[in-house]
Amino acid sequence: MRIIDLFSGAGGLSFGFYYELQDGEFVRRSNIEFVFANEFDAHAVNAFKSNYGDNIPMIEGDIRNITDDKIDELIKGKSIDVVIGGPPCQSFSTVGQRQYDDKAQLYKEYLRILEKVKPKMFLFENVKGLLSMKEIFYERDEEGNIVYEEIEKHRGEHVFKRKKPKIERYGELVIEKIKKIFNDIGYDVSVETKCATEFGVPQNRERVFIIGKRTDLNIEWHYPQGNNTAVLSVSDAISDLPPVGEGKEVSKYNLEPTNDYQRLMRKGSDCITEHYCGEYGEKIRTVIENVKQGQGKDDFNALIDKGLIDRKYYLTSGYKNTYGRLVANQPCTTITNNLATPSGLRCIHYEQNRALTPREGARIQSFPDWYKFDGSRTDVARQVGNAVPPLMAIAFANSIIEALAVK
């Protein structure tokens, strides 16, 4: 099977096609060839290369620089079975309109490569919000440039001003536009929402998976069904990782794994990377120390209203789930690129007074401990939070491999 990975990030989706799960460990698949992968972010590229080396040729940089001649050179006249990965959902929101945002052009580049290589199938995932997203038409001046308006945001006594494009109207659902676009180039498209917990990932992460199959090949495709094992909790995933103090980093295991998931994550690793905690200011530290499992911003402010905590610590910004502490015996909430930030959406450790470490986030995503990331703390958190969970990717890879086995 010959595969191309576009918008690959640090390689979460590639992981599922590169490895399979056998007898409690990740084993490299046979008869799988990655023709090339493409990613723009330099740190994500470094992470990808660190994990796959020369086994997956990486074309670093803007997807627009991958010319048709370059594609011909890479595919060597052979057919492509699957293209995995896809553009961000925002790139579809102004489909069919005159574009000024570079990111909004990405879906066109994706279509260009699909039409060029004509894979038997394609797969990419996106946020659940894609299903409700509508096409946006922006107000424009006589020269066709988008008109911007200034808006004010109030946070307590502070007022922030910023400009945003002025919306003229909303069109039809973006997902319907996507289906039409792919159908026009010869693909039947199916769309389904799946939760990571269905596939042994200890995280309530719902994502939309878009599958395309060529209309001329009569491919029988079925979305993977989740395993029937018990849903894993956040403590099931990370309780064997050593405690980390504020401003500290830990690289040695000091506890034994207590379940199959932890054993799978640790197999092949003799040390821990990216297991560190930043330093907090007095206000953040006060919040963390007073928020219990399942609580968040509103619960903390309620303590202030009761006179139990000084009003100078009152939280005025953020959603209800910000500054939220995880519940030990429940799956983690969705891991995002703010996973190591206490003010993020429910990412405070269920027991320790700190946010999750990047390695804990990677564990919860189902990346094994030997998987490498690259760059600053922000870079690493972005690579972890934006990835498709490897166990989820394996399930989809298995279904696609099965569907194409007779083609």
Per-region residue spans from a language model:
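Conserved S-adenosyl-L-methionine
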Residues: M1-N55
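Redox-cofactor binding/interface segments in oxidoreductases and associated redox assembly factors
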Residues: G61, G85, F124, N337
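Class I S-adenosyl-L-methionine
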Residues: K70-G77, P87-I309
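C-terminal target-recognition/interaction regions appended to catalytic cores
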Residues: E256-K407
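Conserved acidic residues
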Residues: E33-V35, D41, G61-T67, D81, K120, T193-T197
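Extracellular structured ligand-interaction cores
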Residues: I3, R205-F209, Q330-C332
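S-adenosyl-L-methionine
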Residues: N46-I75
